[in-house]
Amino acid sequence: MSQNKQQISTTEGKLCATVNFNWFLKDAEKFENGTRSEPVPATFKALVNGKEAFEELHDRIENAQHSIDIAIWGFQPSMHFKRDGKSPCIGDLLIQKALEGKKVRILVWSLPGNIQTFSEANLGNKPGVWLKDKVEGVTSEQVDYDRWWYEAIQGELDEVIVNAKTDGIVHVWEAHEIEKHEKLVEFTKSPKRTNLIYKNRKVAPQNEDFKPRILPDGRKVNHSFKDTELPDGKGTLTDGSYDFALKKFKSHHQKTVLIDYEDPDLAVGFVLEHNMVDNYWDDSNHSLKTTLPNKGKNSPTPLQDVSSIVTGQVLWDINHNFCQSWDRQNNKQWGKDPVDIGITGKRQSFTRDHYQPNPSLVDDSKLVMAQIVRTYDQPNIEDIMKVYLKNIKQTTSYIYTENQYFRFPPLVREFISHWETIKNNGRTEGPIHWFTVTNSSDEGIGAGTYTTNEMFKLLGRQEVMPGVAREIKREELGVELGKCKVNQAILYNLAIRSPTSGERAALEEKYEANEQEIKRIEKEIANIDLKQRKAEIKQAEQKTQNNENIQHPNAIENQELSQEEANLTKELGYEISDTPGIKAHICTLMPKDENGKYVHTYKKNGKDTPAEVYVHSKVTIMDDVFTIISSANLNTRSMQVDTELGIIMECADVAEGLRKRLWDLHTNKNFAANPDDMHDYAVAEEAFRKWGELIKANKRAQKGNGVAKCALREFYRAAPSVSKSD
């Protein structure tokens, strides 16, 4: 076996920590008080999917004794965290805690004028939002409640009631509806109302990210991002390129909750991936079946996500991050009460040593060494990216990535460079195995098919998104063709003006060679166009056979790949290694129908509609030792633009335990595809083979209208549309 082979992690004392590789970040950010982000004693418990995460949140908030600090991307007051048909929504629960005298702070991302709500319903029905009922499954009663909740917490709901009663019979009805919400009416008049403070937070511009630079290969790019292949644009809204989206639409994407920070013996924290919006509530069954919003899943889109609850010294870091954001001068506090700032000073007497890990506070939690890492705007911190780029060079067996996006090409480039080094140093094992679960739907993949294609190209897997791959290659050839035609005109003019026959002959030779290059490129473009038309015709025929509406192409249909497509990256002329060091399964997840069967499509308005679980997770596990759970997606936005926060651990119990739990869901408890000891290369190799069998079996089942055996489905996206905003 190779000298690079990693051994299984061991423990030191009671804390789970490895003794060979160091998976933590040594050069993490340094804080104002001289300390820095570092691995510290903690407890950790993963919370898989919304039911588990939100019920835990509800119970902890309900039992809070001192304070509740929430930092979140999306907040909907009418959302029910605990869906037993009797528990209050989060808006009422937080009001109740404020009435009890507990301090409640809510920090939610928003852009000036709430302009993000044109497309993102992240504020519920807050007064001033642009889309009133964006989330499918949200009831009109919830929409009304949201608006009244925001009026209540700023002390103006009683005025709304009075005005409604005097504005005619139609508005009298509204007044009566408001008065049914006794908690809102009580709260808006209570002197304890100021115990609940709500702020919106924006992200500071990072102008240094957009300074032009010259790369070592001589190319000029208009940014300083790690991904040097980002498509440059004109920086306009209509251009649709990354530079406008990343410059103008930065988001505060962190998701944390702190309970009772002022009492270290009681304090717990949450590092979340879930947002506090209805469509993030789902259970691990991922059924298409829906019900009332206080009794179960009410959003029609199944959603996969992972959060966590922690104790110990990591709470100090989570609090530091929260206070730093809460006390910013450019936050917008809701209402007219005096602005609540200075929480940093009020808590400065607490140090990490006050917060010892306490397993008794959280059942089934693990004692670990853990480190909080983040992406941040002021100061400019990019530690989550550093962790990924560092640790991918330490993996020796496998990587598991469950992420909303799979498009950070520098991660693959970093590993490919590392692979050459370890091969030269005598590694005898084959490529590592990258198991990936992500999204292929329009909603899930978002506006980033260009960088997703770049990721697939580096992995030699462009066949799973062939339309985009061909379209991008066509664009590249178009640029080449334009340059050749300009050169042709230059050569022609030089030739006819050449003073000697020798010079003229040389220029004519160059002209002829350039002419042949033009013909080659034009032929290649025509060939790409022909193959894309054939693919579209084949897809249309399949949809007709399946009684699908041809006017609504199935963007995620997993077609049987032709031999040509299986070698698409090479066919398109890209130079890739036959042994890049990584073998990748790139998968999406199928939901279940009302009968508990995995389905590729479902009926919506009488038509077959593609069925895909929306993967919102941001989890990566390496070699059954390293784990990161965070708010950060695998893209440039999360690594270098938005604010993000995550927790990293090097602990076999946590890594293997979480990996096995997630794979139990995705493989339908197939032990052969979800074995113990994946740190062992031979075991990972066999598991990779078994995943391949499951994927092929599900593909055959789809083709023959059979029943899939598990949720795993090979990523496939036929649509050729290229998006460059992320």
Please place each PLM-identified region on the residue numbering.
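Charged, low-complexity intrinsically disordered terminal segments
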Residues: 2-726
